[in-house]
Amino acid sequence: MLGLSKILRMGEGRAVKRLAKIADQVMDLDEEYTKLTDEELQAKTDELKKRVQEDGESLDDILLEAFATAREASWRVLGQKHYKVQIMGGAGLHFGYVSEMKTGEGKTLTCVLPAYLNALSGKGVHVVTVNDYLAKRDAEWMGRVHRFLGLSTDVILSGKNPAERREAYNADITYGTNNEFGFDYLRDNMAHSLNDLVQRGHNYAIVDEVDSILIDEARTPLIISGPVEGSSKWFSAFAAIAPKLTRDIHYEVDERKKTVGVKEEGVEFVEDQLGIENLYAPEHSQLVSYLNNSIKAKELFTRDKDYIVRNGEVVIVDEFTGRILDGRRYNEGIHQAIEAKEHVEIKNENQTLATVTLQNYFRLYDKLAGMTGTAETEAAELKSTYKLDVAAIPTNKENKRKDNVDLIYKTQEAKFEAVAEDIAERVEIGQPVLVGTTSVERSEYLSRLLQRRGIKHNVLNAKYHEKEAEIVAQAGRLGAVTVATNMAGRGTDIVLGGNPDIIADINLRERGLDPVETPEEYEEAWDDEIEKVRKESKEEAEKVREVGGLYVLGTERHESRRIDNQLRGRSARQGDPGETRFYLSMRDDLMVRFVGQTMEAMMTRLNIPDDEAIDSKMVTNAIKGAQSQVESANFEMRKNVLKYDEVMNEQRKVIYGERRQILEGEDVEKQIRSMLKDTIEAYVDGATAEGYVEDWDLDTLWNALDSLYGPTFTHEELVEGDEYGRPGELSSSQLLDALLEDANREYDELEEKVSEVAGEEQMRGMERAALLNVVDQKWREHLYEMDYLKEGIGLRAMAQRDPLVEYQREGGDMFNRMKDGIKEETVRQLFLVRNQLKQAGQVHVEDPAAGNEGVAVDRATQTTMGG
């Protein structure tokens, strides 16, 4: 198996052939592994671990045996054996590919193979999913196979405490969402003790729905933030003004770029409302952002589409999946403006404490791989951003899906009436229907139409996400109608006749059995239950095939072709029949922005009635062109986010690297002494730049030194004394030597006194705590300043300067100043302890391992996401 990693450098076609060869070799071992007893199969884990961890073999060397072991275990535990294409997909994941596998090809089972193989190294495997439910389900479901083979699995869920998280990360295989992994990374880099750390490195990640996580969510950075006081009154004031402003008279809106611009008439109106003379005067300058945000909240953010109001809180809805994004908040004041608009409690505006983009988080991993059903449209971005190649894995059976042409109506009302009519006809013959909508609002509108017609149906949107898996599991049954926002329910197969695995699991849980809490009883009951449900499902599936399989009906085109393809891909899995169609109207968002007015005018000229559809290649091509435009614009936006974050990323790596060294270092005294030297050197260089003693700025120097540690002599005593030759002939190097000797002597005295009171170990702990506090404080201030710099950097383009180059240059200067500030402030904080000792004759020294009050406040702050 040596040399298999060369596969990464081959063209996709050649790579897929090599993956097929590996799959054949794994399947050739089937007879040998089938004969093994359970004990012999389970013993393979320790044997393979030893060969990798002790004998020096590579994971490539043991791939065939590890895959054959996990494949046979899957059959014995789940009753499912990997097809050839699933083994190919698993091998692709091991080699760091994005394995593109169509919907229904069994990506979850595929993941078992590379997760098992890579876990044998003992360095940990992270399996990343899009939501908590899927993470928990996969950890339980696929965890049954891994646990059978003697590996530990665990899951990171939003409610878990640090101890539970640490335990989960110490498992061989850890499941969780991208948010949980990313936020734990940020929290680890705010920790003040090694005991507070939860993650144990970034060895290998398998990202499920890789396009959703690495592309759709990549524009939104992960942000841990803390509240800033005293701004809610202005959000309320402008929320009251915004409805009085008229679009195109007081302000303009660019729907494509999602920006607003206030016109002169709008400025005058606002000045009159607030009773001020000049909105742009320095003392009122911050009010401009409140005004812009109130207009954005009014025009660009729609309730039940972009967000919902739940329990008095504004909760964001993912524009791509329709799922609610608990814990995330829009940044830059947008979230507060929406809260003011909806008359709910306005939570304090937040200051960034730690942040990272998903692009840069996932690039921390030594090896990264992913799975998706639709990667071809994003292959270039996956390659350029993450260095990930796409391997298109063939389907297990031929695809029999029939994709009908789009039907286009003049109005949304006519479109939805036609949709309801089509659904009624399908229900009549018992064909299951999955309807995709783009917002909560539209899914509920269609639901009301279906209720009026007496059509039974399930609604799957952000408001009802708890029952997601159960609803999707039943969506392929005879006569089932499921209305879902976008790709809600992704990750759960729609199986004709019902998903037997999910239905059996639900049945067992209703009987009080659980694969984690009561594993033995669950496994004992599983075989009989799954056999019964599979028999029922199989019989019903035949009837569903006879009426045409699953009918997928899209009610609007999405900005991204990939999201449309994902919806279509829910139909005709594993060689089943299936059918799809999109219903559109000239008032749909995408049509309004790109083709609507021209086509609507043409339909009016041709006297086409509202309730009559057209199927026009011209419109279809215009939609494809519009989608390509939007995809390109979004790609550029993500690239732009990444370019700016690259600057922050380099700085973040330096700061987080230094923090980790401080936490892990036995002794930071040398570092403190070095900081003392660097700070005094910088002071002396600044004061003696003129060269001659009489031109030196010694008053300013001594003021700075007094603030830092308090020299034991005056500059007059030093210059006029004869220690360094004749009076007045002091050199700058002699001045520096004298000050360093004095400062180090004072620091020695501090050490002695603290050691007397609390022991030398406490002195080292105090140094570490002081250094960490200052690093965190200065880093927070730096993040704020970098945010401020980025907000205004676009204006540099007006001066014919490249904003990115200016951001890099100024950001670099600010970072260097911050590092100097860390040195200076750390030394100052420690000498303050000496001053307290001198005044009080004793000092109370906190044990840094027990925590730090300031840090505790930070950790308790709200975790949010900017957008």
UniProtKB/Swiss-Prot annotation:
Subcellular location: Cell membrane; Cytoplasm
Keyword Lyase: no
PROSITE patterns, A to Z: SECA (PS01312), SECA_MOTOR_DEAD (PS51196)
Top enzyme category: translocase
Highest taxon of the lineage: Bacteria
GO terms for biological process, alphabetical: intracellular protein transmembrane transport; protein import; protein targeting; protein transport by the Sec complex
Keyword Cell membrane among UniProt keywords: yes
Gene3D superfamilies from the UniProt entry: Helical scaffold and wing domains of SecA (1.10.3060.10), P-loop containing nucleotide triphosphate hydrolases (3.40.50.300), SecA, preprotein cross-linking domain (3.90.1440.10)
EC number of this enzyme: 7.4.2.8
Topology of this chain in the membrane: Peripheral membrane protein
CDD domains: DEXDc_SecA, SF2_C_secA
Broad class of the protein's primary localization: membrane
UniProt keywords, alphabetically: ATP-binding, Cell membrane, Cytoplasm, Membrane, Nucleotide-binding, Protein transport, Translocase, Translocation, Transport
Reaction equation(s) it catalyzes: ATP + H2O + cellular proteinSide 1 = ADP + phosphate + cellular proteinSide 2
InterPro entries listed in its UniProt record: Helicase_ATP-bd, P-loop_NTPase, SecA, SecA_CS, SecA_DEAD, SecA_motor_DEAD, SecA_preprotein_X-link_dom, SecA_SF2_C
GO CC entries: cell envelope Sec protein transport complex; cytosol; plasma membrane
Annotated residues for binding of ATP: Q86, G104, E105, G106, K107, T108, D493
NCBIfam families xref list: PRK12904.1 (NF009538), secA (TIGR00963)
Subunit text: Monomer and homodimer. Part of the essential Sec protein translocation apparatus which comprises SecA, SecYEG and auxiliary proteins SecDF. Other proteins may also be involved.
Family statement drawn from the similarity comment of this UniProt entry: Belongs to the SecA family.
Function: Part of the Sec protein translocase complex. Interacts with the SecYEG preprotein conducting channel. Has a central role in coupling the hydrolysis of ATP to the transfer of proteins into and across the cell membrane, serving as an ATP-driven molecular motor driving the stepwise translocation of polypeptide chains across the membrane.
Record's protein name: Protein translocase subunit SecA 1
Lineage: Bacteria, Bacillati, Actinomycetota, Actinomycetes, Mycobacteriales
